[in-house]
Amino acid sequence: MRKLYVLGLLLLFFGQMGWSQFIQIGTGTTSSYLSGPIYRSAATSTFNWSKYAYIYTATELAAIPAGSMITQIEWEKAAGTITAPNNFEILLANNSATVLTTATTWGVVSAGATSVYNSTNQGFMGTAPGWESYILTTPFIYTGGTLQ
């Protein structure tokens, strides 16, 4: 009986473990220093600030089933080191928007969004282009549709 109980606990434990996958959206081939998520006025600038908003459509996210938990986000960034501590926050929202216009305010973009990553001491990647990875402090449940 004890062996069956332990086996049952192991099956329950391993049954709760999910699988993970990596989904790349877009080509990830930007070579611009101002493409986000951090804006720099020039490649050598010490001015680092931004508020970026991205929309990932249901078509782009078709490989992600509704109900999936997002635990990490990456952006591909051009060269340029930012070593000074910076405030950096990532907000995510499930919604039905299909476009963002230049008239869309930050208040509209951030309304109803969940803060999934927040750092007051964020440095950024080294001098070579590459992926900037963020493990979310608050995992996010994707419900299907557009992700903003």
Language-model features and meaning:
Residues F47-P65, G130-I135:
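Short beta-strands within extracellular/lumenal beta-sheet-rich domains
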Residues G67-G80:
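A short beta-strand element within beta-rich, extracytoplasmic domains
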Residues M1-I23:
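Bacterial Sec-dependent N-terminal signal peptides
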Residues G36-T57, T81, A113-V116:
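Surface-exposed, low-complexity/disordered Ser/Thr/Gly/Pro/Asn-rich loops and linkers
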Residues M17-F47:
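Boundary/junction segments of secreted and surface-exposed precursor proteins
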Residues A63-M69, F140-T143:
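Extracellular/lumenal carbohydrate-interaction signature centered on repeated Trp-anchored short motifs
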Residues A63, Q72, N87-E89:
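Extracellular/lumenal ectodomain signal focusing on beta-strand-rich modules
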Residues A79, N86, L91-Q148:
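Aromatic- and Gly/Pro-enriched, solvent-exposed loop/edge beta-strand patches characteristic
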